[in-house]
Amino acid sequence: MRTKYFSLLVFIIVLASNEVIAKKHSSTPKLRRSDFPKDFIFGAATSAYQVEGAAHEDGRGPSIWDTFSEKYPEKIKDGTNGSIASDSYHLYKEDVGLLHQIGFGAYRFSISWSRILPRGNLKGGINQAGIDYYNNLINELLSKGIKPFATIFHWDTPQSLEDAYGGFFGAEIVNDFRDYADICFKNFGDRVKHWMTLNEPLTVVQQGYVAGVMAPGRCSKFTNPNCTAGNGATEPYIVGHNLILAHGEAVKVYREKYKASQKGQVGIALNAGWNLPYTESAEDRLAAARAMAFTFDYFMEPLVTGKYPVDMVNNVKDGRLPTFTAKQSKMLKGSYDFIGINYYSSSYAKDVPCSSENVTLFSDPCASVTGEREGVPIGPKAASDWLLIYPKGIRDLLLYAKYKFKDPVMYITENGRDEASTGKIDLKDSERIDYYAQHLKMVQDAISIGANVKGFFAWSLLDNFEWATGYSVRFGLVYVDFNDGRKRYPKKSAKWFRKLLSEKKRN
């Protein structure tokens, strides 16, 4: 009965979505700050490896992304790496000034694990220079009236732990992550009141252990011949399991040792697109439900029920899906104060026969996920092929989370679009303004229906190192000149946000 109920729920939301599939917007919606609740937070986001630079300075140890991009430049589209990135390590005061200038009330950043613990664990010692850097950043934010939202892990596993036991493939990572999170809470929690344990664990398992296009670059050979090792049928589920347990242990530490005195909140940032059925058939509707089970629900359901989604349990055969002990399940249930949602795009899902050969996390849902239907894209394409613009998906995803997962407090922790890097300083990004206006309008719609959304973070404050695509695309509200001292130039979209947010001050 439970499965039928939730499948029906998916059908209802999918039917609501179908009314405007691939609808083109002819104009930018007009928004006012007063369209959102008074306490609604607007901010911008970055991550450590993408913007900090200073990869080999002040005692920082290497992460798997240093190894992946520096030792194997052919794995990055333009052969670059994040060793300097946007140089926020040295220019953080300027970046905080930009946040203040735009009018943002919060900044979501991540902490570099290997900058705090160069060898990944307590045995390797704590790097005081790393502690000092984040203290300085946090204090600078607060001096400008900007709330820090800190992410503890944004994909940059210390290389030492990867060498020792395979990083998140090894069960040992759970305790090492708990210790690392403990250090963060102890040193920064008196001022940081909003924490995210993990950023996009789904991307870690999909791109790092199935597709093999992101660090540590593991996959089955039949998926990607460039992978030298890996197993897309088993490793993703083990890594995902350890990520979930690491999250649970970190939340447990905070609640037991720090919450009473620091009075902060701990959540997680999950990414997902919305999945619409390819056709109105019952089979495709079920395929859309399974696609959600293997993406958003994969990491959300254990935090609500202590169990994996039923569709995962049913579809992942041959004992490949780990199970939680009763103790672990109890720890995980309710292990969040809020949920961060990273949304960029949506897809169609089509029912396909379940595969018995060349099985991976991608084939287990028995659903073909595509951005096109009969040759027509679900929405206009940004610079990246995967980013098809479908604003209504953000509304439907928020309502899905509300109704299926006990009405959680939610923040949009990432949302944005990219443009191709041309080598010329181009600050006229009207298409980005249109993207944000359309998505914010849909967030506002979700709130009006009852979604408990408390804030919105634009991705990204700065042009940065965009993982496997390097510097070939730009997501920033602020242009960074990577050829001239990392100079910053606010784009038209930054000025659009400033105008939107200045209404509150005028009123």
Swiss-Prot record:
Keywords: Disulfide bond, Glycoprotein, Glycosidase, Hydrolase, Signal
Disulfide bonds: C219-C227
Sugar attachment sites: N81, N226, N358
Molecular function terms from GO: beta-glucosidase activity
Its EC number(s): 3.2.1.21
Gene Ontology BP annotations: carbohydrate metabolic process
Residues bound to a beta-D-glucoside: Q50, H154, N199, E200, Y344, E414, W459, E466, W467, F475
Broad enzyme group: hydrolase
Signal peptide start-end: 1-22
Gene Ontology cellular component list: Golgi apparatus
Catalytic reaction list: Hydrolysis of terminal, non-reducing beta-D-glucosyl residues with release of beta-D-glucose
Record: active site: E200, E414
UniProt similarity note: Belongs to the glycosyl hydrolase 1 family.
Protein name per UniProt: Beta-glucosidase 13
Lineage: Eukaryota, Viridiplantae, Streptophyta, Embryophyta, Tracheophyta
Gene label: BGLU13
